[in-house]
Amino acid sequence: MLLETILDNLEEFLSEFGDGYSFIKSEYPIKIGDRYNYIDMLLYNIYDNCYAVIELKINEIKKEHIGQIETYMNVIDKNLKTINQNQTIGIIVCKKKNDYLFKYVTNKKIYEREYELVWKAKRNPCFFIVFNYSTKLLKLFSYFLGGFSKICLTINLKGGN
């Protein structure tokens, strides 16, 4: 549901990261050993000259998510990136950040972004996603975020959970 909503509002989503981001593919297949894995979203930034791996998580960020995105970034760097391109960055969009865990992340090309689901009562019930950036991250990565502080996207519920 989260990926579908982002894809429905792709232009708005990309604009929140700043200028130069282009969408390559959702569920981008990569082969690791004899198995295929799928990157939630693969982007490219023409100004930073690098790929961006986006992983969407509906819960609090866990150490396994960091290992997963780092693996995906390494696969892109080894198999897709050219010698003239910069290293791939990774962005984990999660329901809840874990600042304690991120103190120990050694790869400075991995970022976390938190979203919040808020119930909105109207004719058709829907959710809003709000990306909250800490002031520290905004200052450190303002070139990457383009100075934006939040984005709202509507997710229409289609029954079920």
Predicted segments with their positions:
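Charged, terminal alpha-helix-loop-beta segments
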Residues: 1-161
